[in-house]
Every structure is written in C-alpha cells, then in structure tokens.
Amino acid sequence: MCGRMHHIMNKNEHFKSGFVAVVGRPNVGKSTLINALIGDKIAIVSDKAQTTRNRIICVYTDEAKQIVFMDTPGVHKPKHKLGEFMVDAAIESLKETEAVLFVVAGNEKRGPGDNFIIEQLKRVKVPVFLVVNKIDTLKKEELLEAIVSYQDAYPFAGVIPISAKDKENLNEVLNVLEETLPEGPQYFPEDMITDQPERLIISDIVREKILLATRDEIPHAIAVDVDEMKTR
C-alpha cells in the first residue's frame, strides 16, 4: 500500500493523519462522495462495474488533519480467477488502512453485492463505518429501515447518513474520521489532492462521459489515450 512515504512535519502537534479506504458496490456513489469531500473532479463516476480500474488516492488536508482516501476497486464478487486475485489484493490493502468507509445506497435493499462485501470486511480489523448515501431520496422511516438492515449484518463502528450529490452531512464524515485517525504528521504536501497524473485524470473524465453517453452501446472496457494537452 503506497509504501507509507516519508512524513511531512506539521506545526500542529496534535495533527492527525491516515489512510481511509472507500468500498461499496457499483452505483452507490463512492466516487461522487470522494469528489465532494476533496472538492475536485478526481474519481470517475459511472454505474458500470469496475470502471474504477486503478486504486485512486485522493487527499483531504486542513489545519487539523490529513485524510488519504483510497477509492479501492476489486471488492466485488469475482467471476473468474483473476477476479479472485483482485479481491484478495483489495482486502489486503484494506488491512493497512486506519479505517474503512462502506458506502451503500439507502434507497435500495441490501443485496448480494453488499452481502459479499460485508463478508470480506469481516477479514478486516480496522474500524468500518457504514455510509448510507442518497438520503435525499428517503423518508426518515426508510432511512432507519436501511440502517437496521445493515447493522443486522455487521458490527459497524458508526453510521453516517449522507447525500453525496447534495453534499449533505459530509462534514460528519470528516469529523468521524478525524476522531478515528491517530496523531501524526501529514504524508503529502497540503496542496496535493491526488497521486494521479493530470493526463490520466483527463482520460478518465473523457472515459466517464463516453460511458454515460453510450451506456449499453459499448462495453465498459474502453481505453482513452491523451495524445496532446493544451492550456487555455
């Protein structure tokens, strides 16, 4: 996992820092959540499975903390041997984080994909927080029903209802993680928000637009190669 690079000294002696994995099945809003927390377009958004091909690191920094979010692909029910290897690799990476955010869609019933991830999370010893997304589409009793359904399946360290699209209750996500992270200096410069090169971010954004526009017309295994970039 990232090799745990050299720390950068911080003036705040109680500064907190650490790595947080974000997992969940496709179309629950993982990438939308990360983009909203970071305040920039980094992670590709699509309802097709496995559109996030690489583990994307996104960095949130303020005067009190640095949270390194990892949008982790591969935690899904495998269909072949390669898929099994990807799941094992993804779970191993989760074990090296300080916390895990398990993002679910509150407006959908807990399904086989969610249950598979829950079973994998039982192999992880760090705190796992249930993030119930899309609360803007729910009534209070529907939200409560969704929370109870997931709490029956796993002993979460906490539950955070949010709307990533409307940026509702995102501060609670940050506050909960700040309480969870250990004290320590930051890993990345404060102006860094991702480890992804700009060219790769642009190619992913183009790929996202193609997937959204064409949907069933083309497979999700498309590649975009950026030949030239110009600043305007």
Language model features: what each stretch is:
Residues E198-R232:
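P-loop NTP-binding site
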Residues H6-D88, E92-E96:
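Conserved G1/Walker A P-loop phosphate-binding module
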Residues T61-A64, D88-V159, T231-R232:
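Conserved C-terminal guanine-recognition region of P-loop GTPase G domains, centered on the G4
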Residues P127, D136-T194, E198:
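Canonical P-loop GTPase G-domain recognition
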Residues G24-R25, D71, V132, V226-K230:
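Flexible glycine-/small-residue-rich
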Residues D40, V59-E63, P78, S93-V100, ...:
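Conserved, well-folded catalytic cores of nucleic-acid-processing
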Residues A49-T51, P73-H76, G106-R110, I135-L138, ...:
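Conserved nucleotide-binding/hydrolysis micro-motifs of P-loop NTPases
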